[in-house]
Amino acid sequence: MAEVLTGARIFDGARFLDGHALVIEAGEIAAILPEAEAPAKGRRAVPGILAPAFLDLQVNGGGGLMLDGTTDLDGLRRICAAHRALGTAGVLPTLITDTPKATAHVIALGIAAAEAQVPGFLGLHLEGPHLDPRRKGAHDPALIRPMTDEDLARLCDAARRLPALMVTLAPEAASPQQIAALAGAGAVVSLGHSDCSHDEAQAAFAAGARCATHLFNAMSQIGNRAPGLAGAVLAGKPGAGLIADGIHVHPAVMRLALGARPEGIFLVTDCMAFAGTDLTEMELGGRKVLRRDGRLTLADGTLAGADLTLPQAIAVLVRQVGIAPERALRMASAIPAALLGLQDRYGTLAPGRPADLVLLDEDFALREHRLSP
């Protein structure tokens, strides 16, 4: 029997539909129609907001585990499952700067996860090691290094074999030719952890980079005579992830950025093993990460990822930044889906689509979620 969800404001990926019902049959959306025209049987009132389930393209871990050179397939399943429990239909598990051996292990793991059809696994995000140590953030500077021909060959092969691959790199550590080769192999090249100039950033984007990693964090900032990487992102058209916890980027700066870029900026959590748990401490490459008052930091106070969920980020955008709910919801679903070329699968509620959806309350807290296997 069909399930008929009533009483919610339905966000279909573009607009809110009030007074409508969403009908689900066999795991798919069968119809969205005025409540007066909806079937009487199978009705269930779900006050709140029904919206497309989320995508998160930067998750370093979850469920008590980090993605690293020791993660096995069960561990990767656990990471993905932790995020699905938070309403996120798909993630790019993210490996931060590590050894060549660890990188090769994680790539092989990702290929195995794709073959095993791990629920929620969209591909991989390799954040480093080809970064600028001047903008290392919480990455281990001893492991940061320029890209070699061997690195490039490994990454291009991974891009061809994985369903999706995002590679965060700094233009200082990879040439335009290497960036072009990566993009040509199908990787989403994202600029980050970089102190590059505006001109260097533009050259990297011209070569094929089409995204920036955690906008404003660990990158050259906007100056009146030196616009930096942040300026190149805001003046151009690349995608850009944004950690909207109100800590990594001030709400006023987010407001300016979103005013400059009507499209392209999307939400990420940059979360760690803490996601979906009550953990208060963890180890990161032998260094302790502390979870205190909504912050994740190393002992010296350096931010080390975010203690954030996508519903929380949406609430920050709406309540603190002043962004319309429609846009905030798109930033957690349709916009990242489009960056990965998955707009026909995620980000929209429409007849014939899988019933991947979330139910949020009036404060954007997650109440329920429904995700395809």
Language model: regions and residue ranges:
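Divalent metal-dependent hydrolysis catalytic cores, especially in the metallo-beta-lactamase
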Residues: 60-62, 77-106, 119-132, 161-174, ...
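Active-site glycine- and acidic-residue-rich loops that bind
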Residues: 99-105, 172-175, 188-195, 243-259, ...
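C-terminal cap of metal-dependent C-N hydrolases
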Residues: 8, 338, 343, 348-373
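Divalent metal-binding pocket/active-site signature
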Residues: 126, 133-228
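N-terminal metal-binding scaffold of metallo-dependent hydrolase/deaminase domains
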Residues: 1-38, 363, 369-373
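Active-site-adjacent C-terminal substructures of enzyme catalytic domains
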Residues: 200-327, 332, 338-343, 363-365
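Residue-level marker for buried hydrophobic side chains located in beta-strands
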Residues: 53-55, 190, 267-268, 358
